[in-house]
Amino acid sequence: MTQHKLNKAYETFSKVISLDPNWAEGWNKRATVLYMLGRHEESQEDINEVLKLEKRHFGALSGQGLVQIELKNYERAINSYKEVQKIYPSMQSPKIMIPQLKELIKSESI
């Protein structure tokens, strides 16, 4: 997706949020766009809003894992993926990411 399209998507989801701030998916979609724009702290802020509205939103929790990886908060990323596993045990990304993150933490501590 081009930078222009991402910026347009950001504007659109910001308007959606202003119209209905209680719709978790509006926050989640904007969090995704912010992640794609490399605005990871802002993405996490929107994920926090999603989880206030819907604490079992596995998409937001999975996205939080990705954001926390970018912010180098690997333990927090692992915790996010563990929460996803509780809600959606058959989702594959936590099964892949948790071992990789544990290995990364181990290699960085050497």
Q: Model features per residue range: what roles?
A:
Residues 2, 36-37, 70, 100-107:
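Register position in tetratricopeptide repeats
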Residues 15-16, 49-50, 83-84:
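Canonical positions in the second alpha-helix
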